[in-house]
A protein has these predicted regions:
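Sec-dependent signal peptide recognition
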Residues: 1-7
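N-terminal signal peptide c-region/cleavage motif recognized by signal peptidases
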Residues: 12-14
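Extracytoplasmic
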Residues: 20-25, 74-76, 96-100, 124-130, ...
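Amphipathic beta-strand/beta-sheet edge segments enriched in Tyr/Trp
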Residues: 20-29, 102, 106-109, 206-253
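C-terminal/domain-edge helix-coil "capping" segments
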Residues: 21, 40-56, 105, 112-121, ...
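N-terminal segment of the mature soluble domain
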Residues: 42-68, 127, 131-195, 295-307
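Signal peptide-directed extracytoplasmic domains
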Residues: 62-135, 140-144, 160
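A short, hydrophobic beta-strand-centered structural micro-motif
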Residues: 74-87, 177-180, 193-226
């Protein structure tokens, strides 16, 4: 029965995980269509793709990656110009550019770069996260922010926060959801409990959403205008906590979430080997051609399997 146990271990790594597409594609802002702008755009796009594939933003600082960035065009399959979407984060497009460069990279070339540089890989079958975000406001008090949050206390800064969160998670290729904050959520988890980062309460409130991991984040604006906060996440039966402080609430989400994802993704990633290993898996009671096809499809979906 050992072969069956091996398969169970692989599939149970992330029960509710979702398949993520476009991991080898990046859209970046550029000032114009000149050759210099295209080269810089391709360089930026390669950084984005490597961060998205590895789950770690620090990889672009490695010497092996830096040398590859100098020849980023070697990894390109196709490029195209297009207008940037309105929801592009101010953090990603600080100069307010309107033109974007979409870069499609070669799967095999990028995979070889990752293997050669011994970088981690976050599989395309990725964990789905749920975010519990609570803001402490002088006038409105402590208040959870969800996907349907509206009302007078929902500020422009809150709206920007939601856009930034959505953009960062898309850039990182991580599926996520926000709670609906309906009556069931309100009865299960109060804003005060979320503010206290009460793990047991947050875990119970997250169960109905079928997420692989949860993230709780609290923040407030101090008297000097700076943003202060903390976050905690739970993944693979382990929890992690950290504090953060930023100058402004307009763009604090991208750096905070990127740091958080760097740590969380490590629980779901692996480092591919330079040499190929062979594992013989025996599957019993395959009684039809249809069953055989389904088994093949499931095996070939695994990042670790080549053939």
């Amino acid at each position: 029965m050992q072969p069956i146990l091996i398969l169970i271990m692989v599939w149970s790594h992330s029960i509710f995980a979702e398949e993520v597409d476009d991991l080898y594609i990046s859209l970046v802002p550029i000032p114009d269509q000149t050759l210099a702008s295209r080269h810089q755009g391709i360089n930026d796009a390669l950084k984005n793709v490597l961060v998205k594939l590895t789950g770690n933003s620090a990889v672009v600082q490695l010497a092996a990656v830096q040398s590859s960035l100098k020849n980023a065009t070697l990894y390109v399959d196709a490029i195209s110009f297009e207008a940037l979407p309105n929801n592009l984060s101010i953090y990603d497009n600080a100069e307010g550019l309107n033109l974007g460069l979409r870069v499609n990279f070669s799967h095999s070339a990028i995979d070889n770069l990752i293997r050669r540089s011994e970088l981690p890989v976050l599989p395309s079958n990725r964990p789905k996260l749920i975010f519990w975000i609570v803001r402490d406001d002088v006038e409105a008090g402590r208040r959870l922010l969800g996907k349907d949050t509206k009302g007078a206390s929902f500020t422009d800064a809150d709206e920007q926060l939601m856009r930034d969160l959505s953009r960062v998670m898309k850039d990182r290729g991580i599926p996520f959801i926000l709670p609906s904050l309906d009556l069931e959520d309100q009865l299960t988890l109060s804003a005060e409990e979320a503010w206290n980062l009460a793990s047991e309460k947050i875990e119970i409130a997250s169960e109905r959403y079928g997420a692989d991991a949860w993230v709780a984040m609290r923040f407030y604006r101090s008297s000097n205008g700076k943003i202060r906060g903390s976050w905690k996440y739970w993944a693979n039966n382990k929890s992690y906590f950290d504090d953060f402080g930023m100058e402004s609430d307009v763009s604090f989400i991208p750096p905070v979430i990127n740091e958080l994802i760097d740590g969380l993704a490590g629980s779901f990633s692996y480092v591919p080997q330079k040499t190929k290993n062979v594992l013989i898996v025996k599957v019993f009671d395959v009684q039809s051609l249809d069953n055989y096809k389904k088994i093949n499809e499931e095996l070939t979906r695994l990042e670790l399997v080549n053939s």
